[in-house]
Amino acid sequence: MTQAATNSAGTFAPLRQKVFAVLWVATIIGNTGSFIRDVASSWLVTDLSATPAAVSMIQAAATLPIFLLAIPAGVLSDILDRRKFLIVVQFLLASASLCLLFLSASGLQSVTSLIALTFVGGIGAALVAPTWQAIVPELVSRPDVKGAVALNSLGINISRAIGPALGGLLLAWFGAAVTYGVDVISYVFVIAALVWWRRQVPEDDALAERFLGAFRAGLRYARASRELHVVLLRAAVFFAFSSAIWALLPLVARQLLGGGASFYGILLGAVGAGAIGGALVMPRLRARMDADGLLLLSAVLTAAVMGVLSFAPAQWVAVAALLVCGAAWITALTTLNSTAQAILPNWVRGRTLAVYLTVFNGAMTGGSLAWGATASAIGVPFTLAVAAIGLLSVGFAFHAMKLPKGEADLIPSNHWPEPLTSEPVEHDRGPVLVLIEYTIDKADRSEFLKALARLSHERRRDGAYGWGVTEDAADPGRLVEWFMVESWAEHLRQHKRVSKADADIQDDVRRYHKGPAAPVVNHFLAINHPHLG
């Protein structure tokens, strides 16, 4: 078997698992309906108001809710039944499209109603996105997770190839009401697939997280993960500049290229078709380039496409350029998504992917508004040229900030012993102070502190909100590491969160310990008493 055939088989291997295959097909249908709706709304706003600011507001209305709500949605995806949660949200999205159908059929549609209902659709997307990504490990075996992530991206772009073109044709032939009606029907398939799925619900866990605690834990993890910071920064700069093409494409189609609704759909369909092609050749690209090279290639190609469009080329040239844009877009998106997935443990995946989605959509929202305002001031062609130059500049400038490899073993190690207590401790009691006492030779002190600094990031990622190290004034070789956890339950969760990679870091720290026994660990609980103030 050739390497290409092996790569292809690996790409589609997750579809051999029935539940994943059914939900994957259903999401393609649902996303196709969403793209049909978005094409109708984006084009209708150019009929109602042709100003760049109004057109870019549609893009902003779709992405702003994800920026605002993705993190709370990620928390919900980690603490609720994901299947039931998705079903409720699909009904919300269907209701928004029903309202668009009614307003269009009755002739009451306006820029305000389009933006408002697009915002509601964005709320639904914000609630769905981290949940769909978080359920992937439930649907496939561990070796197939990366392939399933890539297939999710491929599925979205199959929808992007079909939906916009179909939406443009439906809008041109039958009008907005029928177009929105097709979107409503698409949700029926998604809801049916979710109802059919018999998800294995985890048993009730006495340590199950509550919303606010889970929210804080997710933010603590994101704040302490340096690898995630690199992914977020690389994503932010790429999407902030590349968002110009999405914010201004309706105006490019209508004003620069002289096309109608069906041509706009063809342009978006070209993006999707290019993305499908890009997804199919990505295994070969990955064999030749690392993640940083793929992201730089995406930036160069996207900038080139914006440069071509700024010259108002012939329509066929624009279609060809957007085929390239689609391939570049899925390359960047899949590279960043798979990197984020690879560095996140299961317990915090939904929440932390939501942080990534927040940055992604924040960059898209802010970029869309900024490029819309810029186009109002200097025109669409010059704005595209400025965005292209900016994307090239940041692409090369940030290339030296290498993306993480995602090779750490994040499976829970379960190597921490149960804490010793004189009697059972109530789960909500806290805060908890944990002390670990080491005996360190003077010659090893510097290397020990370096290893301990690496361990501090693991402590904070897994739940600590304060961390430090102290020494005994009478015995400088006696060092005490301490960290604070907000409750006893949260500390018990730490025991479950520590990964095998974290265990390796802890082993590196403990090899400097020279005591006759293992480092002594003590747990101190806060005392709440009226005389203590």
Regions found by a protein language model. Name each.
Residues 7-64, 220, 224-270:
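Helix-loop boundary and gating motifs at the non-cytosolic
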Residues 23, 109-117, 230-231, 316-322:
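Short hydrophobic/alpha-helical segments at membrane-entry points of transmembrane helices
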Residues 42-49, 101-106, 162-182, 251, ...:
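Transmembrane alpha-helix termini and helix-breaking/packing motifs in multi-pass membrane transporters
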Residues 52-53, 142-152, 261-262, 346-355:
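Loop-to-transmembrane helix entry/capping segments in MFS-fold secondary transporters
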Residues 58, 68-72, 79, 83-85, ...:
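C-terminal transmembrane bundle of multi-pass solute transporters/carriers
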Residues 117-158:
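Cytoplasmic helix-loop-helix junction between adjacent transmembrane helices
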Residues 134, 138, 180-210, 288, ...:
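Helix-loop junctions on the cytosolic side of multi-pass membrane transporters
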Residues 404-406, 457-466, 484-521:
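An amphipathic, aromatic/His-enriched active-site/gating alpha helix that lines ligand/cofactor pockets
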